[in-house]
Amino acid sequence: MESTARLETPIAPPSFDWRQLLRDFYDLSKPGIGFYSLLTTATSFWLASTVFHPVLFLHTLIATGLVTCGGGALNQVIEIEADSQMRRTEKRPLPSGRVSPLTGLLFGVLSAAGGVLYMLLFVNGLASLLAILTLGGYLFVYTPLKKKTHLATLIGAFPGAVPILIGWAAVRGSLGPEAWALFAILFLWQIPHFLAIAWMYRKDYARAGFPLLTVIDPEGNRSALQILNYTLALVPVSLLPTLLHMTGAIYFGGALLLGLGFGVAAIRAATQRTNTTAKQLLYASIIYLPVILVLLAVNKI
C-alpha cells in the first residue's frame, strides 16, 4: 500500500522562472546598443533644446527604446542560424532555445511597431520617419548584406547613427547642420569600434559565413587602413559642434584630447594587429563616445 501511494503521488510541474524569462527578453533587446541609442538621443535632444521639455523628452526616450529593443530582437530572429555557429552568440536566447523564434518575432514586431506609433503620436512625424528609416536600414539592408559583402559595416553605420538625429528632430521638427554634425561624429565612431570587434572575433565570423573585412583580408591591411582613416577623420569632425557654436572651449579641448587618445589606440591596432591591441581599441571606443556626449551636454552654449 505504501509503495502504491508513492506511485500515485503527483509530480509537481517545474516552476516557471520569470526572472530567467526577463533576462532573456533583456538580452533579446540588445541592451548595449539600446544604451548607446538612448544616450545619443538624449544628448541631441538636450543640445537642440532652448527650453527643456521633460515630458517630450520622456516620450522620445520611451519611443526610441521600444524601436531599438524591437530592432535588436528582429535582428536576432533573422540571424538565429548564424548566431548558433558563433561562440560569442551561441548562448543568446534564440540559438540556445530558451526563447522560441515565434516569441522573438512577436516581441520584436510589437516593440518596433509600438515604438514607431508611439513616436508618431507623442513626438512628431519626422522623428517617427527617422525611426522607420533606422529599422528599415538595420533589418532590411544591413542585416542581409552582412552575409554578402564587407561593405555592410559601412552601410550599417548609417542606420546606426540615426538615433542622434531623432533627438534633434523631436525638439526642432527639422534637421539643420548641427544635427548632421552630430550624425557624422557617430557615423565615423562606429567603423573603428566595429572593426575592433570584427578583428577579435574574425574566426567566429568566418565560421558563420560573414565575409567581413577582417575575414576576407586575414592579414588585416585593409582593416588597418579603414581603422586609421575613420578614427583620424573623427578628430576634426568632432570639433564641428564648437565651430557651429553649439559648444564652448571646454568641449573643443576635450574632444581634441579624446580624439588624439582614440587615434593612438587606432594606430597601435592598425600597426600591431593583435587581439590585445584590438581589445584596447574597443575599450578606447567604448570610453570615447559617452565621454564626448557628456562634454557636448555640459558645455552646451
Question: At which residue positions do the language-model features occur?
Answer:
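Transmembrane alpha-helical segments that form the membrane-embedded catalytic/substrate-channel core
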Residues: 66-74, 136-144, 185-202, 235, ...
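Small-residue-rich segments of transmembrane alpha-helices in multi-pass membrane proteins
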Residues: 39-42, 92-93, 155-171, 222, ...
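Membrane-embedded alpha-helical segments that form the functional core of polytopic membrane enzymes
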Residues: 39-80, 88, 112-116, 129-140, ...
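Intramembrane alpha-helical segments
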Residues: 101-171
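Interfacial loop-to-transmembrane junctions
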Residues: 219-222, 263-291
